[in-house]
From Swiss-Prot:
It comes from Enterococcus faecalis (strain ATCC 700802 / V583). The keyword Manganese applies. Pathway: Carbohydrate metabolism; pentose and glucuronate interconversion. It catalyses: D-mannonate = 2-dehydro-3-deoxy-D-gluconate + H2O. InterPro entries: Man_deHydtase, Xyl_isomerase-like_sf. It comes from the Bacteria. Catalyzes the dehydration of D-mannonate. This is Mannonate dehydratase.
């Protein structure tokens, strides 16, 4: 596998590349241009500058996470063709720079949601937490205020200040948009961008809903196996694939993750590998990566990935804040670095067991 690490760029991340480089076995980073808003075209010069900054530290730029999709595309407004053209141009520019992996999401208004970005555990570590009971007593605007108040001054993707300023406009844009509408709008988008991906040798991976159920009455279309199979059927191409996030999908205990991996493994283009701990119905903590820390059997998940022959990019995901580190919530160095070495150990042991058979 290719061992990755998410990095938000020198201006947006507290972690320097030279520290990421010291993680054993690291292959490279999955990067982004944090200053780009949904709908902006990424220029070749900007992409090359990002790539060169990574390669100068002895790492590879393994992919982009994410090229955000403008809400006009997701809501299906009459402006969507303009923004799809911009997205197609960005894909062409990424292809010119040798980028072969793009993660994206297709969620209305909220890319992800948590109700506590600094939930204190008994050992003093801080985790991200979601509690549906808290959401039931909130308005969507309150979620923006909560996230910003706990962001530690970092620019959190999907929760940019610019989006808060446009919030009423966004609510109006999605008024009346159903799950079926959202699926058809995704089909419209994929039918126009996947041919470009095929030309440029780029694989797309749609990220699951986080959490994988409806909040604030907004439609969700990447919640479970049936949803993911439906998306793969919209455009039957290896370029139209899944970012399989074990933490997002695993937050719903009715999702059988090993079965999901085996069912759609041939179309998994990217893996986020992390654990969650169930604290009650629709209440969970994003805990440390090992099985002992949470509710998922991480060894079983690695076995499923090995069984389907997955050898693409895999990275640790949301980690705890530990050892008094000051970093973006969920994206500190220490817990994710330990997570990556744990993932590598699982892979090594699983492959060794396979080879002894």
């Amino acid at each position: 596998m290719k061992w990755g690490f998410r990095w938000y760029g020198a201006a947006g991340d507290a972690i320097p590349l030279k520290h990421i480089r010291q993680i054993p076995g690291i292959t490279g980073v999955v990067g982004t241009l944090l200053n780009k808003l949904p709908g902006d075209v990424w220029t070749v010069a900007e992409i090359q500058a990002l790539k060169q900054s990574v390669e100068q530290e002895g790492l590879a730029l393994l992919g982009i996470e994410s090229v955000a999709i403008h809400d006009a595309i997701k809501a299906g407004t009459d402006q969507r063709d303009h923004y799809i053209d911009n997205y197609r141009q960005t894909l062409r520019n990424l292809g010119k720079c040798g980028i072969s992996l793009v993660c994206y999401s297709f969620k209305p208004i909220f890319g992800w949601a948590k109700t506590d970005l600094a939930y204190e555990n008994e050992d003093g570590s801080l985790s991200l937490l979601f509690d549906q009971a808290v959401v039931e007593n909130m308005q969507p605007e309150d979620m923006y205020q909560l996230i910003h108040s706990q962001s530690k001054g970092f620019r959190l993707p999907g929760w940019e200040e610019e989006r808060l300023q446009q919030f009423q406009e966004l609510k109006a844009m999605y008024a009346g948009v159903t799950e079926e509408d959202l699926v058809e709008n995704l089909r419209y988008f994929l039918e126009r961008v996947i041919p470009v991906c095929e030309e440029e040798n780029i694989k797309m991976g749609i990220h699951p809903d986080d959490p994988p159920w409806e909040i604030f009455g907004l439609p969700r279309i990447t919640k479970n196996l049936a949803d993911l199979k439906r998306i793969l059927s919209l455009v039957d191409s290896p370029a139209n694939g899944i970012t399989f996030c074990t933490g997002s999908l695993g937050a719903d205990p009715t999702n059988d993750l090993p079965t999901m991996i085996r069912e759609i493994g041939h179309r998994i283009n990217f893996v986020h590998f992390r654990n969650v701990k169930y604290l009650g119905e629709h209440r969970f903590e994003e805990t440390a990566h090992p099985s002992v820390a949470g509710s998922l059997d991480m060894a079983e998940l690695m076995q499923a990935l090995v069984d389907v022959g997955y050898e693409g990019v895999i990275r640790p995901d949301h980690g705890r804040a530990i050892w008094d580190e000051k970093a973006m919530p969920g994206y500190g160095l220490y817990d994710r670095a330990m997570g990556l070495t744990y993932i590598q150990g699982l892979y090594e042991a699983t492959k060794a067991k396979q080879n002894r058979k």
